[in-house]
């Protein structure tokens, strides 16, 4: 008797998402954690299942549950109260104020990125993405068969955008430049003057600016956060955000996309209609969280963010100071935001390390330490180190990193100064 697997079935799995999935951060992260020994020393960073958020946010969700205000389906574009609350919150410092109609609630910032890519994707179109940058922009672009062109940064100028590289990449099929501010993984925050220059360049090139601002609440450097929407009088701007990083609730899956459109360009070019159509056929963020958004945004005390930012600043100072004892890694600037250190890998310092992926694979196997390779962020032979952990745990992680580098080193390189210069 023939088994079912012997039958020549007329169906098979689609490979439509294969290439995109290979570029996702989740694929890199899962592969590295799988190399760690669950019976060895504690795996770092720990894969936390419990995150502590603001008590105000927790109360807001409980209130929505008890009142039943989050039990029903939400409109495809988002709950009116949530959209209004986001608009009011983001309007601080904006000369051109947002309305609820300019806000689209999304299933986290990832769906906001998907929305930004999908509503603009056309045959032969290309998009400018940062290198390095958050992989989800690349993942979605690959999935939509968009041509991706990577622009560069100037590490010696605190990772400002290299406008010459932007100008050289644009042609008649380029529709947008994506930026991340504060930047993941560089950790820098753009000045108002730099963002204005970007807006003027984008206007000249006739492309829009899409700004991922999800890390705006993790700022701890001297530069203030400046929203890209402030320059919508110069160029059409799309901003992306969510409560995941600021409130430490990535599992709540609630974000937004906003259209900053002074002269109705998005309406005239049918971008507004495309955004509405996209959300009509896609999943919505949890209604119960949307119902809690007004209280979360309005009532969370500043002390919550101050405490979080102080914690991150302390860890950056600690981690940055320790890196000077690892000559094979160069951190060009002390981060001003986010939860990472971004370092360049000097392959000439090692006897048996081929590239950043090989470094991270061996590090995971030998030290139970997960550091992400730069190739995951479209920049080969760099590394992203998480610093979002308590000081004793971070110290352990950095000691393991140094031990690994010393063990594989082919020489004793000179000590670097605190600025990462050899």
Swiss-Prot record:
- UniProt keyword terms in alphabetical order: Lyase, Pyridoxal phosphate
Query: Does this entry carry the keyword Lyase?
Result: yes
What triggers expression? Induced by jasmonate. Induced by coronatine. Induced by 12-oxo-phytodienoic acid (OPDA). Induced by wounding. Induced by abscisic acid (ABA). Induced by the cell wall elicitin from the non-pathogenic biocontrol agent Pythium oligandrum.
Task: Give one GO term, molecular function aspect.
Answer: transaminase activity
Mind telling me which Pfam families this protein's record contains?
Aminotran_1_2
EC number(s) per entry? 4.4.1.35
Q: Which GO terms describe its cellular component?
A: apoplast; cytosol; plant-type vacuole
- What is known about the tissue distribution of this protein? Expressed in cotyledons, sepals, pistils, flower buds, phloem companion cells and vascular tissues of petiole, leaf, filament and fruit.
Which InterPro entries does the record associate with it?
Aminotransferase_I/II_large, PyrdxlP-dep_Trfase, PyrdxlP-dep_Trfase_major, PyrdxlP-dep_Trfase_small, TyrNic_aminoTrfase
- Record's catalysed reaction(s): L-cystine + H2O = S-sulfanyl-L-cysteine + pyruvate + NH4(+)
Q: How does it assemble?
A: Homodimer.
Q: Report the protein name in the record.
A: Cystine lyase CORI3
The species this protein was found in? Arabidopsis thaliana (Mouse-ear cress)
């Amino acid at each position: 008797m023939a088994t079912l697997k012997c039958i020549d079935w007329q169906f098979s799995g689609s490979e439509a998402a294969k290439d995109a999935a290979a570029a996702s951060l989740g694929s890199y992260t899962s592969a590295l954690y799988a190399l760690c020994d669950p019976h060895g020393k504690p795996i770092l960073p720990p894969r936390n299942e419990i995150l502590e958020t603001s008590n105000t946010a927790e109360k807001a969700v409980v209130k929505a549950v008890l009142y039943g205000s989050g039990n029903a389906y939400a409109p495809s574009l988002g709950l009116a109260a949530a959209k209004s609350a986001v608009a009011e919150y983001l309007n601080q410092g904006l000369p051109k104020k947002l309305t609820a109609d300019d806000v689209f609630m999304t299933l986290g910032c990832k769906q906001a990125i998907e929305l930004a890519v999908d509503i603009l994707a056309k045959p032969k179109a290309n998009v400018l993405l940062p290198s390095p940058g958050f992989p989800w922009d690349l993942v979605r672009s690959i999935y939509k068969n968009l041509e991706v062109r990577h622009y560069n940064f100037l590490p010696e100028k605190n990772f400002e955008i290299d406008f010459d590289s932007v100008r050289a990449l644009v042609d008649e099929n380029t529709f947008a430049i994506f930026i991340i501010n504060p930047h993941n993984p560089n950790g820098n925050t753009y000045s108002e003057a730099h963002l204005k220059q970007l807006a003027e360049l984008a206007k000249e090139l006739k492309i829009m600016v899409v700004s991922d601002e999800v890390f705006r609440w993790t700022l701890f450097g001297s530069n203030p956060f400046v929203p890209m929407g402030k320059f919508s009088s110069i160029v059409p701007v799309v901003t992306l955000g969510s409560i995941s990083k600021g409130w430490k609730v990535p599992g709540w899956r609630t974000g937004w996309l906003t259209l900053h459109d002074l002269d109705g360009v998005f309406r005239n070019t049918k971008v507004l209609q495309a955004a509405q159509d996209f959300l009509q056929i896609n999943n919505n963020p949890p209604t119960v969280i949307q119902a809690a958004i007004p209280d979360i945004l309005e009532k969370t005390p500043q002390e919550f963010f101050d405490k979080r930012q102080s914690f991150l600043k302390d860890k950056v100072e600690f981690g940055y100071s320790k890196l000077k004892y690892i000559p094979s890694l160069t951190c060009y600037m002390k981060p001003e935001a986010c939860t990472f250190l971004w370092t360049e890998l000097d392959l000439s310092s090692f006897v048996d390390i081929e590239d950043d992926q090989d470094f991270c694979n061996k590090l995971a196997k030998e030290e139970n330490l997960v550091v992400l390779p730069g190739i995951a962020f479209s920049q080969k032979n760099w590394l992203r180190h998480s610093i979002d952990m308590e000081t004793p745990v971070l110290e352990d992680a950095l000691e393991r990193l140094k031990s690994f580098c010393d063990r594989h080193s082919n020489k004793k390189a000179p000590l670097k100064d605190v600025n990462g210069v050899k």
